[in-house]
Amino acid sequence: MVEFHRSPDGVALHGREGLWLPYPVEYKKGSDKTQEADEVQLCAQALCLEEMLCCTIPEGSLFYGEPRRRTRVVLDESLRARTLSLLAELLENQARGHTPSVRAHKGCNACSLKDVCVPRLSRTGSVHAYMHARIAEDSP
């Protein structure tokens, strides 16, 4: 979600007076995590907004449903560099046609993509068997 806060450093919004600075808020079902994946996701969203709206977004928030609390995230140079580094790695893998192997872990059950997860799908057998099963599901 993106909130817009009135700011002299903001951008003009159609139908609104004044200048408004985008403030990305990423909602998460569970609680805060020790790894930085949520912060990187928020930063990637902010980078996209910055490019689309020609502005600089200094911070955003993560809202965790478990404690029902927002956590402020400063989008500093270190986080931006980490996010851009991961993006470069992703693009390199895509260009090579390479999908990195991933192991299932305890956080997988809370993931919104668990039903289409590559580690889980790869345990079901070959691509041919998977496609055959999906086609069979759609057949009358």
What residues fall within each predicted segment?
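Well-ordered beta-strand positions in beta-sheet-rich domains
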Residues: 22-24, 39, 70-72
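Metal-dependent nuclease catalytic regions and adjoining charged, substrate-binding loops involved
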Residues: 50-140
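Short, solvent-exposed loop/turn segments at secondary-structure junctions
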Residues: 32-33, 70
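Short, charged, amphipathic alpha-helix that recurs within catalytic cores of restriction-modification
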Residues: 38-51
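Short alpha-helix boundary/capping segments
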Residues: 33-41, 75
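Conserved catalytic cores of phosphodiester-cleaving nucleases, focusing on short active-site segments
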Residues: 1-32, 44-47, 111
